Amino acid sequence: MERAFLFAECDVDELNDISTSMRNAGHAQLADRLDKGRVGATNAGIATVNVVRDFPVALVGYGYTREHASPDRARLAPLPHDRQDTRLPLVAIETRTEGILVELAPLTLWQWCARNGWCPPPSVDTPEEVARAWLLDQTYAEPETDTAAAIRRVTHAYSHLLMHALAYHSSYSSNSVAEYLLERQASTLIYVAKYSSFNLGGLATLAEQHLQRWVDSATSSAWSCVHDPICLSERGGCHKCLAVTFGCERFNKGLDRGYLVGGGPQDIREGYLFTAQQVAP
């Protein structure tokens, strides 16, 4: 499991542990602010937020194209090399960076999918571990079900919301970060995509001290776009609300704000953010 690999190979700090460390060090106000942010994240349908301090990244280039950005249409030209040599040159950059791992709440996802008619609802007293097992059963099913597709697309859309909101609460813009999607676990890792130099600790500070503002800003922006109603009803998202210039694993394909707020090209009955508000403790 990709998520298990992150916890096994990287330095990952849970916000609960960070809050405890703050209190033990005499920083009660910072701990209170962090705990308030964790509650706000829960109310926004987020189960956990973790700080990843040494995420390994390797960028490898083996060709280029100036015609099509779509991988299925592009025909790559190899990097210059000796044509007598059967080997192709690769250009690679290896580094470690920092990121924030965000996981959507499995039980809230289950309730959201049920409200939209994609699956039967959970029982009233469904424990968290059962909801997590349900999530994996759905997302690893072959062929992909409507439920799995919805989980994949809402995870991707939520990831872009959070990337867009970074500019208001950190030293990074949406062009300075990238996403590593773990859609089968309804998770996304947003990491710094500046590989030569960056301010180490910038994202960690965001998660530890400004989590509430970051999440509130992201979720509030989902409900409207300057290009509405065309953006939501016809496209599902645009560069003003969801799309990013760099850092998207899917080249901004499949983004649909309707999965977050309802409506959109797929005419989603109820958005995930609305469900999260309704079922929040």
Question: Where on the chain are the PLM-derived regions?
Answer:
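C-terminal accessory domains/tails appended to large, multi-domain proteins
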Residues: 1-281
